[in-house]
């Protein structure tokens, strides 16, 4: 399905989505830090997020300093997949808040552009 007009085909990036995997015990503190940095606003709503439980696995290698477990031992731990949005201009603040509040030595996170039509 193609665009019917040039105007309908124009999009802009004004927000991004952060997806991060957080241990169950750290969900609230990470959310609080992200919200304080400006994440979680959608229209007239604040503190917007979505999370679902899952199981994370990892094996800390030599030279790692794992928060949970020991080097050389594979671990499985209950985690949440946490998603929230933020304005692009706050990306540095949001990522800094994530890294400072997340308990893992190497937090796993993704940043996605959210395209919005120009109207």
Language-model-detected regions and their locations in the chain:
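Hydrophobic structural segments
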Residues: 1-119
């Amino acid at each position: 399905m193609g665009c019917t007009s040039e105007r309908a085909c124009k999009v802009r990036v004004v927000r991004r989505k952060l997806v991060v995997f957080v241990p169950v015990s750290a969900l609230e503190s990470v959310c609080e830090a992200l919200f304080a940095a400006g994440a979680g606003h959608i229209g007239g709503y604040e503190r917007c997020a979505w999370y679902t439980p899952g199981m994370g696995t990892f094996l800390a290698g030599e030279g790692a300093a794992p928060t949970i477990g020991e080097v050389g031992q594979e671990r499985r731990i209950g985690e949440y997949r946490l998603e929230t949005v933020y304005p692009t201009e706050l990306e540095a603040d949001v990522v800094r808040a994530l890294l400072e509040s997340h308990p893992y030595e190497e937090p796993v996170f993704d940043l996605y552009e959210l395209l919005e039509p120009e109207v």
